[in-house]
Amino acid sequence: MSTVERYRLVDEWANGVELYDVPSVSCLIDCGRRVPALRTAVRCGDHILTYAELYERLDGGVTGPAGPTLDDLARLLCAIAAAAEIGAVLAELGPEGAGLKPVAVAAAADDRRAVAADQPSCPIDRAYGSADVRLLATRWDTTDAAVELLAALADGATLVLSTATQRTDPAALAELIAVSAPTHVVADADTLAALAFVTAPALPTVRRWDVFGNDCPAALSALLRDLSPGSCTGFAYTAPEYAGVAARGPLDGSGRVRPIPGARLLVLDEDMNLVAPGQSGRVYLGGAALALELDGATEGFVDDPFVPDSRLVRTDAFGGWTADGWLVLEVIESASVAGIPTATPVSVLDVDGYAAA
């Protein structure tokens, strides 16, 4: 392996651009204080919390119950704010035996804001924030929910959180999207793929679909664009050990991604050696939003062999680099198994760029 190739695999391709001027948790929260008090901050089922009610809880006030999900989500937001003040690690977030620093959650929220701003529903008012409605189909007690809520508050948007029934019943999910009229929808591939098996109404308000996880079915993009003409789609690679998204790419079935700012992705063999472009290996993840080990020996965490005093986590994903710097994840076919017609599954060796590697 040449010196240039090695540099690309360890540094140029492996690292997202350096993080710059990431707002703190308190700064993100304070942005929401200028939003009209009666605007809905978060909704789940028949329950809502307005900006006034949510910020009253953040300030230590007492408000009436808003349902178990929103009450718990508000408590989680308060815990994040409190941890940020003293620099504590959030054991509530992250995998077992690890936790997240508030700055990691803030960095993930800042990335989410940048993605949402790429497809605004209307010009953003500097005083009153955004009129976006962002729908998230996941549990309240996940890092994704915390990140999405922080990003929505900072932008003055409304977050709609799906119920357990809506996540598992595609007809209920389609109805939720139609009724809540979101501008952005964030969910895993299986949840959105199920929309193919119901008579879904037109969903013209959705401007962007973000599919997270490690499943990138080719047919899903066409399905979502048919439901929302003029919308765009994106694939976001995530792992439990990393706050928010680690890498992004097109939702085209190839599984190709590049690390987001602050993230680090390496492809290594069983002996922790670099895998050359055109070959497949295990994906290791590190960077600014990596979870911290609470007991010093959490399973899957290893030293970065190329950066002193840095840690990586061994993910469940496999993939390889193309000759032009895309990381191609080996595509998981769970959405295909669910029944969506797809093209032939993609192998990392079939993607343009490997032949030239």
List the predicted regions and their residue ranges.
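Conserved coil-to-alpha-helix start sites within the AMP-binding
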Residues: 70-84, 97, 138-155, 167, ...
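ATP-dependent adenylate-forming carboxylate-activation enzymes
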Residues: 47, 88-100, 141, 157-177, ...
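Conserved AMP-binding/adenylation subdomain of ANL enzymes
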Residues: 111-112, 116-134, 142-183
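Generic structural signal for small/hydrophobic residues in well-ordered secondary structure
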Residues: 32, 66, 140, 145, ...
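AMP-binding/adenylate-forming domain of the ANL superfamily
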Residues: 2-85, 89-119, 217-221, 261-264
